[in-house]
Amino acid sequence: MSGLLDLLEIRKAYGDTRVLEGVALSLAPGEVVSLLGPSGCGKSTLLRIAAGLDDDFQGTVERNPILGFGPDGENGRSGGIGVVFQEPRLLPWLTVAQNVGFADGWLEDEHWVERLLADVGLAGCGGLLPKQLSGGMAQRAAIARGLYGRPQVLLLDEPFSAVDAFTRMRLQDLLQDVVQNYEISVLLVTHDLDEAFYLADRVLLMGGRPGHIRREFHVPLARPRDRRAVELAYLRGEALTEMQRAHVL
């Protein structure tokens, strides 16, 4: 493996309970990979390991040196990894703009914050407090915060599961735009079949306890995509059959 981010033979246990066993994946530049599977199969644990938020595991995480570039690196990108969680986790005493720029010294780059907010559909909302946002708006702010450091890789842990179906579709379309406009690689954790195949170039189906990758699906469709595409319906059916065969539904 030689991608931007490589996970090699990852194993993880909580005491005597093994939660991950021999998981390997690679994320290439500009690629979107979905980790699809039921609750409890280790998807979120694997993402935390990839993000560097959990170092109590066996195996290897290899990050391409480009992820360590400073602010003056190629194309003005700082490199590194951005993370978006299931809940927005906005600090309630800060404005939306302050939340987005908080990680880099309290709005050192206000113009960049304004651009990010515009790109995620929150133009003019920078002065609002989190309590004034809807759930979908708060998650848009969280995505902007994840992009603030100009990362090469964005990791998302079920980022749209807490919003209604219509808001979820709008946020999925927003993520497609982000991938194209920012030329970013994405690792997405989801339990939603439609979401996994609509957004990803590759879908890694996880299951079992301890969790492992059961099957890999390639999605050979250009973006933007049509949710009604026959190819997507076929791939969803294949994944559903595999999940039923593995008794994970």
Swiss-Prot record:
The complex is composed of two ATP-binding proteins (SsuB), two transmembrane proteins (SsuC) and a solute-binding protein (SsuA). The lineage of its organism: Bacteria, Pseudomonadati, Pseudomonadota, Gammaproteobacteria, Pseudomonadales. The keyword DNA repair does not apply. InterPro entries: AAA+_ATPase, ABC_transporter-like_ATP-bd, ABC_transporter-like_CS, ABC_transporter_ATP-bind, P-loop_NTPase. ATP binds at G37, P38, S39, G40, C41, G42, K43, S44. GO terms for cellular component: plasma membrane. It is a peripheral membrane protein. This is Aliphatic sulfonates import ATP-binding protein SsuB 2. Its EC number is 7.6.2.14. It comes from Pseudomonas aeruginosa (strain ATCC 15692 / DSM 22644 / CIP 104116 / JCM 14847 / LMG 12228 / 1C / PRS 101 / PAO1).
